[in-house]
Amino acid sequence: IEVWVDGEWKYLGACEPEPRLNIAWFTLPVQRAMYVESEVFGKYNGQEEIVYVNESGSGVNVTSHYTRTVPTVVQVIDENGQPVENAKVEYKIFNYGEFYPVVTLYSDVKGETSLTLGQGDIFVWASKGKKLGFGELSVERQDTLTVVLDKTVGDLFSGEWDLVPPRQHDITALSTDEERAVNDRRFAREDSLRNVYVATFMSRTQGGDVAMELGVDTARFAAYMVASRGNYSELLRFMREVLPERRTLAMNLLGVIAEKDLQDTPADVLLSHVEGDGRDVANPYFTEYILNPRVQNELLTAYREAVREFLKRHDITDVTSLIQETGKIKVVDSLYPAKVVTPPVGVIRAGVTDVLSRNVFFVAACRTMGIPARLSPISGKPEYYQNGTWHTVNFMTEKVVPKGELMLNYAQKTVSDPKYFLNFTIGKLEDGRVRTIDLGSNAAVDMGVGASYKTIFTKPVTLEEGDYLLSTGNRRSDGAVLADLVSFQVEAGKLTNIDMLIRPCVEKMEILGVVPTALSIVPEGKTKPEAIRLPEKGYTAIALIEANKEPTNHLLRDMSGMKDDFENLGVPLYFVFKDADHQAKFNREDFRAFPSVMRWGTDLDGRLLKGLAEGLCLTNTESLPLIVLLNAKGEVVFVSQGYRVGLGTQIMNIISRK
């Protein structure tokens, strides 16, 4: 959040405000940002770079508000060295296993685009028609990059890059002790108000009691009620009002929607999706693609009754007539620049919408008719399942897209079981641009990674024929990503075998400092301090954390997401709250299960923090979490303060070394 004060834009800490402006939990990590963008409603006439303008707003480059920047230029040329006008230039950052486009610009008559960026590395992908090219722009070393469109869609190519983020610079305390004390009192007051409300949420025990009353699975129901947080009363009303013979159906509905849906969906919406007749519950796709009300990322609404009336009014009795009627809906994408999905009821009432909303409507209508349907995870196009086949729909003619198979072969041990949307992704190359396909997302995990390689590729995966890219990456402890890209083709009716390479991170095991080995904490459930047991061989982690703070929450989500990996390693890890107040505020049920090797405790009178800070010469001890990896001699080889991407993986990379 930014505010205009004294003639300039300044930022504040969003839902965790600090004593002064331009201080937030992200003040340190945002120095490592390559690009920061703000979306402004309407036209914007400020001094910052405008990266796009549409009917609803403007995209503003605000990177310079947060970190050191450099103006850069990308020139696109053809194979003859001539500038290419109107080439599409995508600036990409490796994030969640893919080269993600953060900005898209189009070249001018000189073949150039300009953009102000942070002082790190960024991947640039340029295309026009069937021609494409790419390269790495290392902003700290160069301010200009030339990209040659020397490749054609269908060519086979590969490349590897070490993408280094901007350097983080140490900063002194930005607020005084007095200001911090006043702000902490505000936080305490806010926490007390919040905790009074949170205390009204249904507990796991209470959920189990209600489950026994309703005659449903105790553990499942209790888990849903705890996950629903402040929305528990709506779920409770839903389960009490649904007909007893449909409670199993109702439980399956709660199990198939995302955790966030449990927290904000009204009972009436849930009830609407278990009403009606003719449910083919024996269909193997029933729960996921018929009962499930979610099609994409739209708000869940009660649409089935309105869709039934639409089907009846237009005498639609099969999928063919539904395709014909849906094709009559007027599509005007230009009216929907915000790309917010119009609910199916809104599409029916207006008779005009955008492509995505029309496709969502079609899938919702199919599911209402009892026909399994989805937006293809591969192409994003609407599909329905009939006679053992998924059929792709284009609303003019029914089309069965030729398909082939892909098998990724991974024999390395760089990463024991690579995760989709973390270590690798697959994207389809269409008209020069890459569209990442969803082979294993995990909507139930907040900012979590997807399914693992061993889960996805137990057998070959079916894909549409065409050109594809495999992106892989491994993040070092300094934030740099060892990224690779390889293209391949999938041919109709054939099996394509591709070897997946994830380059190992060779960490520089420098001794960053030496801390006392006689470190102690007050273990969870105890009142007296006990010594931290450092490993005889290798390294362990000590993390000083705060409760209900975003940087700590990110770290804890990383740890729960890697539960099996850390348990297989078997090394004790110490997670220590800065004081007893923070330990008291922490609610473990807000997170998924943690690795059993995590040892919880409290820092007694700040002694642990003081010992670590003195040994490491830390000038700023306010930025938490503080993660230290050390051996039995107290030699520290890794230090991290505040928010950092992929901390769980970085901890694993170091302590798993033999």
PLM region descriptions:
Residues N587-L624:
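Short, internal strand/loop/helix patches
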Residues N95-T116, G432-T458:
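Short, acidic Ser/Thr/Gly-rich low-complexity loop/linker segments typical of extracellular
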Residues P71, E79-E98, Q119-G120, K413-A443, ...:
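Short, ordered, surface-exposed loop/turn motifs in non-cytosolic proteins
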Residues N86, E190-A350, V360:
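Secondary-structure boundary elements
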Residues S623-K658:
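Thiol-/selenol-based redox modules, centered on thioredoxin-like
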Residues A531-L555, M559, P572-F575:
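Short active-site neighborhood of thiol/selenol oxidoreductases, capturing the structured segment around
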Residues I1-E48, F123-V124, K312-D315, S321-E325, ...:
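Hydrophobic/aromatic-rich core segments of domains that either
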